Design a protein with these regions (language model features):
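Segments that shape or occlude catalytic/ligand-binding pockets
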Residues: 35-85
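Active-site loop segments of alpha/beta catalytic cores
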Residues: 1-40, 45-52, 131-417
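A contiguous, low-structure linker/loop signature
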Residues: 83-154
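Short, charge-rich binding segments
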Residues: 65-69, 100-102, 178-184
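Generic structural hydrophobic/aromatic packing signal, biased to beta-strands
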Residues: 21, 67, 75, 110, ...
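Residue-level detector of functionally special positions within alpha-helical transmembrane segments
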Residues: 2, 71, 96-99
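Short secondary-structure boundary micro-motifs
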Residues: 5, 76, 92-95, 102-103, ...
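Short, glycine/charge-rich beta-strand/loop segments that flank catalytic centers
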Residues: 76-92, 193-199
Length: 417
């Protein structure tokens, strides 16, 4: 099987010749730049600096030689903009606090504050307040909350819609070119158009905007889902309309040349509980996901990707009814997320994309033998009758031992033959 055939087989809940593997196709299935550098050294690949394409989590680009060495079957397509609003182009070297030199966009602009922390600026505009902070001994950027005082009677949903706009012709062309490049790899393609996630808390503070208005504080947003529900409904309703208009234009440009679309990264689970009740999810979020995914399934062949960390078993039936085809990252370490239970209960109706290894404890802190054992067990559980794409539980974090990453890859290869 080709990589694409392998992925399409598992998405149709048929067992392929081996378990498909994804690393680097999305912002939630990626690898930290430091780990990519270590893997390149391990595999004896050409010496080159790693490109940090998403500074928020310091995720790096996996070049073709590394993808082949890792056995990657999925190719990502997205617009070349970062979470801090600047475009990836004209790469330049930059040294991280731990001394690792990487490549960043020419539009990447940072300063260092009195504490030694690194501040990053939206759209690379240093006349605007910084929107992200990397601690002096850190490995990625945290969003800086820039919440203006809230005057209740002046709240305007349009302020929280500033980032949801019609795609430009240049945006469409970026995606079209990306799709063409993905097709040439022979891998399955997953696309992220943007603007389709309702209430994604990573996006609420808008680190990509110079002067965000509306409700941008994380705690205030969660409070608003209860106390200002009409306000949130107005945002989601308009956002849904804009998203469908954008997807219509994208589909006109690329047709069914991609196999899946990243729809949503909104987290509904915590380690032990949830951010809202199922009732709140059904009332506030479900109608818009149902509408958006319904349009996708009616007008395209694209499969739909739902990311939600944490304990989300209680939401899975609603996710499925809302039109989601995949669940990621499948956080088996969270309460109620036992791998066998998930596969037995939902495995014929949803594809599990992730869950392959615990990135909180086992991958970063376990032994290679412990990594190997858990990967084989997860593959055995999740791959039965297809419906499984191997990935870690969320991104591979900084300081993860390369020997453990290699043990993980070796175990997947061993399982598949």
């Amino acid at each position: 099987m080709t990589s694409r055939e392998r992925v399409l087989s598992t998405l149709s809940h048929r067992e392929p010749d081996r378990v498909p593997i994804d690393f680097g196709s999305t912002g939630v299935t990626g690898v930290h730049v430091s780990c990519i550098a270590g893997l390149r050294d391990y595999f004896g690949l050409e010496k080159r600096l790693v490109k940090a394409h998403e500074p928020y989590q310091m995720l790096g680009i996996l070049d073709e030689d590394l993808k082949q060495a890792m056995g990657v079957d999925v190719e990502g397509v997205s617009r070349p903009k970062t979470l801090f609003g600047y475009r990836n182009r004209d790469w330049k070297p930059w040294r991280m606090p731990d001394g690792l030199e990487v490549l960043v966009s020419e539009e990447f602009r940072v300063t260092t504050d009195a504490n030694g922390d690194i501040l990053i600026y939206p759209e690379g505009d240093m006349s605007a307040p910084p929107s992200g902070r990397m601690p002096k001994d850190g490995y990625f950027f945290d969003t800086i909350i820039r919440q203006e005082p809230i005057v209740e009677e002046k709240l305007d949903p349009q302020d929280n819609l500033e980032e949801f706009k019609p795609l430009t012709d240049a945006d469409i062309e970026d995606l079209r070119q990306g799709v063409n490049e993905a097709q040439r790899t022979g891998r399955a393609a997953i696309m992220n158009v943007g603007g389709t996630a309702f209430g994604d808390i990573a996006l609420v503070p808008a680190p990509f905007l110079k002067h965000p208005k509306g409700i941008r504080d994380v705690a205030e947003w969660y409070v608003s889902t209860s106390s200002r529900r009409d306000y949130i409904h107005q945002i989601f309703s308009r956002q849904c309309d804009i998203a469908i208009d954008n997807l219509t234009r994208v589909h006109q440009a690329i047709g069914d040349a991609v196999d899946a679309i990243f729809v949503c990264g909104t987290d509904f689970g915590t380690q032990t509980s949830a951010f809202c009740s199922v009732k709140t999810f059904r009332e506030l979020y479900f109608p818009y996901y149902k509408t958006l995914n319904g349009w996708i399934h009616e007008h395209t062949t694209w499969k739909t990707f739902k990311h939600s960390c944490g304990s989300v078993e209680r939401f899975l039936q609603s996710f499925i009814e809302g039109g989601f085809d995949f669940l990621n990252p499948v956080q088996c370490s969270a309460t109620g997320m036992d791998a066998s239970h998930l596969k037995t209960t939902y495995g014929d109706r949803v594809t599990f994309w992730g869950g392959g290894i615990d990135t909180q404890q086992v991958l970063p802190f376990g032994t290679p033998e412990e990594v190997h054992t858990q990967v084989l067990e997860r593959c055995r559980i999740f791959s039965r009758n297809g419906g499984y794409v191997f990935n870690t539980i969320h991104n591979v974090q900084a300081r993860t031992p390369v020997k453990n990453i290699v043990a993980m890859l070796d175990a997947v290869r061993e399982f598949v033959g």
